Amino acid sequence: MLGKEPRESLQPQRLDYLNEGLALERQGDFEAALTSYRLAFRDNPSDSRILLNMAIAFTKTGQPEEAIRHYKRALELDPSLVGAHYGVAFLLLKRGDAQQAAEHLRAFLARPPKGPDAERWIRHAESALRDIASSPAQETL
Protein backbone atom coordinates (compact mmCIF):
# COMPACT_ATOMS: atom_id res chain seq x y z
CA MET A 1 0.00 0.00 0.00
CA LEU A 2 2.60 2.48 -1.00
CA GLY A 3 0.98 5.89 -0.47
CA LYS A 4 -2.52 4.60 -1.12
CA GLU A 5 -5.40 5.24 1.21
CA PRO A 6 -7.54 2.35 2.40
CA ARG A 7 -10.40 1.63 0.04
CA GLU A 8 -13.00 2.59 2.67
CA SER A 9 -11.87 6.21 2.82
CA LEU A 10 -12.53 6.61 -0.90
CA GLN A 11 -16.27 6.09 -0.47
CA PRO A 12 -18.25 9.27 -1.20
CA GLN A 13 -19.66 10.88 1.92
CA ARG A 14 -23.41 11.52 2.01
CA LEU A 15 -23.93 15.15 2.95
CA ASP A 16 -26.71 16.18 5.29
CA TYR A 17 -28.13 18.94 3.11
CA LEU A 18 -31.02 19.67 5.47
CA ASN A 19 -28.74 20.45 8.41
CA GLU A 20 -26.43 22.38 6.11
CA GLY A 21 -29.42 24.47 4.97
CA LEU A 22 -30.50 25.08 8.56
CA ALA A 23 -26.99 26.24 9.47
CA LEU A 24 -26.85 28.57 6.46
CA GLU A 25 -30.26 29.96 7.35
CA ARG A 26 -29.10 30.67 10.93
CA GLN A 27 -26.20 32.61 9.39
CA GLY A 28 -28.64 34.63 7.29
CA ASP A 29 -27.56 33.15 3.95
CA PHE A 30 -31.03 32.25 2.70
CA GLU A 31 -30.07 31.83 -0.97
CA ALA A 32 -27.40 29.26 -0.08
CA ALA A 33 -29.85 27.63 2.34
CA LEU A 34 -32.34 27.25 -0.52
CA THR A 35 -29.70 25.47 -2.59
CA SER A 36 -29.05 23.04 0.26
CA TYR A 37 -32.77 22.51 0.80
CA ARG A 38 -33.24 21.74 -2.90
CA LEU A 39 -30.51 19.11 -2.68
CA ALA A 40 -32.06 17.69 0.49
CA PHE A 41 -35.47 17.54 -1.18
CA ARG A 42 -33.99 15.78 -4.21
CA ASP A 43 -32.76 13.07 -1.81
CA ASN A 44 -35.97 13.01 0.29
CA PRO A 45 -38.95 14.14 -1.85
CA SER A 46 -41.51 13.11 0.75
CA ASP A 47 -40.00 15.13 3.63
CA SER A 48 -42.46 17.92 4.38
CA ARG A 49 -39.99 19.57 6.80
CA ILE A 50 -37.69 20.37 3.90
CA LEU A 51 -40.53 22.07 2.02
CA LEU A 52 -41.44 23.97 5.19
CA ASN A 53 -37.87 25.25 5.52
CA MET A 54 -37.80 26.15 1.84
CA ALA A 55 -41.02 28.14 2.28
CA ILE A 56 -39.51 30.04 5.20
CA ALA A 57 -36.37 30.82 3.19
CA PHE A 58 -38.46 31.94 0.20
CA THR A 59 -40.38 34.26 2.53
CA LYS A 60 -37.15 35.72 3.87
CA THR A 61 -35.82 36.32 0.35
CA GLY A 62 -38.93 38.24 -0.69
CA GLN A 63 -40.49 35.49 -2.80
CA PRO A 64 -43.95 35.12 -1.25
CA GLU A 65 -45.56 33.24 -4.16
CA GLU A 66 -42.83 30.59 -4.08
CA ALA A 67 -43.21 30.43 -0.30
CA ILE A 68 -46.97 29.90 -0.60
CA ARG A 69 -46.44 27.18 -3.19
CA HIS A 70 -43.95 25.36 -0.93
CA TYR A 71 -46.12 25.71 2.18
CA LYS A 72 -49.06 24.22 0.27
CA ARG A 73 -46.94 21.36 -1.06
CA ALA A 74 -45.72 20.65 2.50
CA LEU A 75 -49.35 20.54 3.64
CA GLU A 76 -50.23 18.12 0.84
CA LEU A 77 -47.60 15.77 2.28
CA ASP A 78 -48.52 16.43 5.92
CA PRO A 79 -51.81 18.27 6.59
CA SER A 80 -51.02 18.42 10.32
CA LEU A 81 -47.89 20.56 9.82
CA VAL A 82 -48.97 23.51 11.98
CA GLY A 83 -45.96 25.65 11.08
CA ALA A 84 -46.97 25.51 7.42
CA HIS A 85 -50.56 26.50 8.27
CA TYR A 86 -49.25 29.46 10.27
CA GLY A 87 -46.77 30.63 7.65
CA VAL A 88 -49.06 30.32 4.64
CA ALA A 89 -51.93 32.01 6.50
CA PHE A 90 -50.04 35.26 6.93
CA LEU A 91 -48.72 35.25 3.36
CA LEU A 92 -52.25 34.69 2.07
CA LEU A 93 -53.48 37.50 4.30
CA LYS A 94 -50.85 39.86 2.86
CA ARG A 95 -51.93 38.80 -0.62
CA GLY A 96 -55.53 39.69 0.24
CA ASP A 97 -56.93 36.17 0.43
CA ALA A 98 -58.52 36.49 3.87
CA GLN A 99 -60.89 33.53 3.52
CA GLN A 100 -58.15 31.05 2.71
CA ALA A 101 -55.92 32.62 5.39
CA ALA A 102 -58.69 32.12 7.96
CA GLU A 103 -58.93 28.43 7.06
CA HIS A 104 -55.21 27.98 7.71
CA LEU A 105 -55.36 29.99 10.95
CA ARG A 106 -58.18 27.74 12.16
CA ALA A 107 -56.15 24.65 11.25
CA PHE A 108 -53.17 26.08 13.15
CA LEU A 109 -55.28 26.86 16.22
CA ALA A 110 -56.95 23.43 16.15
CA ARG A 111 -53.55 21.84 16.87
CA PRO A 112 -51.43 24.62 18.38
CA PRO A 113 -47.72 24.02 18.87
CA LYS A 114 -46.06 23.58 22.24
CA GLY A 115 -42.89 25.25 23.41
CA PRO A 116 -41.50 28.55 24.67
CA ASP A 117 -42.64 30.70 21.72
CA ALA A 118 -45.95 28.93 21.12
CA GLU A 119 -48.09 31.30 23.18
CA ARG A 120 -46.93 34.30 21.14
CA TRP A 121 -47.78 32.54 17.85
CA ILE A 122 -51.16 31.42 19.18
CA ARG A 123 -52.06 34.96 20.29
CA HIS A 124 -50.94 36.33 16.91
CA ALA A 125 -53.09 33.78 15.04
CA GLU A 126 -56.11 34.44 17.28
CA SER A 127 -55.74 38.19 16.78
CA ALA A 128 -55.48 37.82 12.99
CA LEU A 129 -58.54 35.57 12.93
CA ARG A 130 -60.53 38.13 14.96
CA ASP A 131 -59.41 40.89 12.57
CA ILE A 132 -60.53 38.82 9.58
CA ALA A 133 -63.89 38.05 11.19
CA SER A 134 -64.52 41.72 12.02
CA SER A 135 -63.52 42.97 8.57
CA PRO A 136 -66.56 44.32 6.66
CA ALA A 137 -65.55 42.39 3.54
CA GLN A 138 -65.48 39.15 5.52
CA GLU A 139 -68.91 39.27 7.14
CA THR A 140 -70.00 36.36 4.97
CA LEU A 141 -67.37 34.03 6.48
Feature locations, PLM:
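Conserved structural position within tetratricopeptide repeats
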Residues: 39-42, 72-76, 110
